[in-house]
């Protein structure tokens, strides 16, 4: 049974509009990830945007709980139901139906469509919600309805705002399978399993804690797909269901080990984490040192450590991507389009971590011998900083030993060394916290952007706010103006804001707060609420922005055409004199690729294609082939822009014909983070300025070279540099003394000059069997390097032993390794010990 489809079809038959799953990266500065089904509708519940039509929605929302307040990462693999990635089925009513219908719908679906036995079902309600208690008695015996307090049956979004009692449906998995002291309704056991939560949003909580009835109560429900699938299939763990077992079976096949539930935590961790990794990568999140990308890295590295426990010593997670796409690509079709890209990103990240995991685990195990209760914060920091072990990975390993890590010391070291910190998730909402935008929205509704059609207009001032976003009736200083109709485009979708004039005041910026367009004006003549003013944009700036914005669409199309359909937009910036476009791709672009992309964009410009703008429902737009961006939030009808072969959803301003863009030049290509590249480019006047500057630079180079033929001048200089390098190398070359023991040439020596790696390579090339360790001191900095050729001795172990004597550390490959040291007084001791180690090995 396809429960996902059955649920959506059921509620569609009840007048609900099916809403596609929103992005995992939410349009909400307070959240790291979308972690519940109601997140996409939060602005409707809080009144920030008007109720939709129809006022009934249903969805299957993908969710991540692996960072921030809602974090299930530590429990995954060790319980039957915790996941970092899950799907939440939900039905929502925005001031339409309420408790009676919500309860009736839930009961009908559970008993008639899922056909769960009624004698296995129980219900909870809030202890003061007599209405819900009485309504449930129409469907289920009174004895099966339990009352609980706020802790279990009251839901609220935050300290203030919409809230209300909730009612939960439970499924009894059977006394014969669960008989612990906590296996009762309301207990912490697993016998009675919550499958559906119905939230009755009927109150508004004020700052002083007072609850006031909402004029139009709403419904928010959530049912976990993984949980209900397991119940329907008669499984006691989500991981034993058809949503996970194909992945677990593939893991078992790859590691050649049989999965047994009681000892299979590592299988479950990997199965869960590959789902999270696939969906996050598919939606544009990339491996990074901070923020969402760091959470993704933590998830994958935790899975890799569990893979190490199963015997995986090479990259393997990327081999599981096909199974996930086979399981879920039917509903989430974008997974199939991104499959090859996802596999490559996971493989590269695996190889990055696997190159250090063995050394890291060795250090962890050494410190474990000295640990009684608390693991050293210094060692935990070293594992993080040198070997890429996130702190929670170290904590996870310690948890298996019933130990804890000294987190306080770890954090102290992080701060002292200004190490990489997790991203600070503060958005535009912080700088406007004092502004009562909700009040403005309720008073005036959304003001209207007329800038698509008009460059100037007469408009009424609805509200004025000072620089601290406090409402004022008059404004002489700099501040914010809310016009009834505004021609000024607010910063959105990467496009920078319009500037211009309002009355005699210069408009410097326009931003959108709670769907209100507010323009920031310089100090000047007094403005009053109710004034009719003339508003005029800077048309020259708007035109240049439009040219650069349209060019990003052509660039996006060219990238997908030349590099592959895995390419998707990961960010953009559009200004009047430049554009910046971030996109998903696993490696730097070659010179040939950049030339082809630049050429393709200019071809599309020269084709002189008319811009076609259409408004249509989101699903119709997607079916037409229009590209929708994962980090954008779409509601109702959407605006579709067609420029030649490019077709995207976009609310920005654009040229009427591609020929207006002029010339397109790529200025720079660079990496942003793992799996994300960036192209910076210019068009139109900025392109002419770029070419002019390039020609001026070339002229300066000719003058410096004193040669009009730049290439021959550079070639001559390179030959001179090479000659000087060879002279320097020969002058600093040190003759290395060595001795032969049992056919192995050995050199252990301190040197002062020369290229230490080149000297080791030269030494190894001279002999069939060789071991060499060199210690070099420059500016009181100690560098060690070792090389081994056809001898049963590891260079990494040899150099590490010597480095530890010198108060340092290091390592590397079996045939070549480097390290650093600190204590100059112990160089002779390190040399002596290294020689003894080599002789013993032979």
UniProtKB/Swiss-Prot annotation:
Documented EC number(s): 6.1.1.7
InterPro entries registered for this protein in UniProt: aa-tRNA-synth_II/BPL/LPL, Ala-tRNA-lgiase_IIc, Ala-tRNA-ligase_IIc_anticod-bd, Ala-tRNA-synth_IIc_core, Ala-tRNA-synth_IIc_N, Ala-tRNA_ligase, Ala_tRNA_ligase_euk/bac, DHHA1_dom
Statement: the UniProt record of this protein carries the keyword Nucleotide-binding: yes
Domain of life: Bacteria
GO cellular component: cytosol
Cofactor: Zn(2+)
Domain statement: Consists of three domains; the N-terminal catalytic domain, the editing domain and the C-terminal C-Ala domain. The editing domain removes incorrectly charged amino acids, while the C-Ala domain, along with tRNA(Ala), serves as a bridge to cooperatively bring together the editing and aminoacylation centers thus stimulating deacylation of misacylated tRNAs.
Family: Belongs to the class-II aminoacyl-tRNA synthetase family.
Function comment: Catalyzes the attachment of alanine to tRNA(Ala) in a two-step reaction: alanine is first activated by ATP to form Ala-AMP and then transferred to the acceptor end of tRNA(Ala). Also edits incorrectly charged Ser-tRNA(Ala) and Gly-tRNA(Ala) via its editing domain.
Protein name as it appears in the record: Alanine--tRNA ligase
Organism of derivation: Campylobacter jejuni subsp. jejuni serotype O:6 (strain 81116 / NCTC 11828)
Lineage: Bacteria, Pseudomonadati, Campylobacterota, Epsilonproteobacteria, Campylobacterales
GN (gene name): alaS
